Amino acid sequence: MKFDGLICGDSDLLLKEMLDQNISVDLILTDPPYNLNKDFGNDSDKLSLDDFLLITKKRIDLCKNLLKDDGSIIWFGIHHYIGFIQSIMYEAGLNYRRMNIWYYENGFCRTQKAPLTQYEPFLWFSKSNKKWTYNVDDVRIPYKSTDRLKNPIYYKNSKGEKVKWEPNPLGAMRGDVWAFPTLAGKVFKDERTEHPTQKPESLITEIIKAYCPKSDKGFYEGTILDPFHGSGTLGVCCEKLNSQGHKIKWIGIELEKKWCDVAKDRLDKILTLV
């Protein structure tokens, strides 16, 4: 089998086949089922805790072995289980880099007996403890204020010299809280599908920009794998970037034909515009 683009099938079997073919990837960016009884067309989100953790461990072990030596995993989760998943990553021999937070901006709550849910965590682990990709300048954000320009701040550099702080022309460094709205409301009607946990393209594109390797000329050119491709957001984002001159190879594996069809339809619309 050729592993390139959208593939409809069981990620457990297909990840093993990728290993048999000696395929390796630079980045694994995935949003697997959270085991919250969502309807994905099968029982993958309705498991006992033990079964959920066992399946998660198997997938993470396979993913680790598919990573290049300087590769990274970005794994979305939910606050219920993210601690378990983080422990599984440690046990697999992966190296913790950061727990990032996707801050919804437009969260919701189904109960009056708990705080409003406004975030989902996503873990970043690297295969190596010495080398990984993080494109800091590609994901800078606007400064919140200009107070530092009005009231200059001085600091001592590595030589002990007093230096005036100057703003980076590209913006402030991104923190570990990533603020992007969910796909709610009319403004997102063209992007939104029926998939119950679809992530916004704006968020996934920003993550790709942060963690995908680049060529000497500044183009993204790594190989990205999503073993739980869902409605196809990763593929759509990669193809939109490729239409700008980047050369990202992506592999999206999805079990359910319904979501494969949705992903294919979204991709077809993008590719006809290229």
Describe the role of every protein-language-model region.
Residues 263-264:
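Conserved SAM-binding loop
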Residues 269-274:
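Positively charged, low-complexity nucleic-acid-binding target-recognition regions
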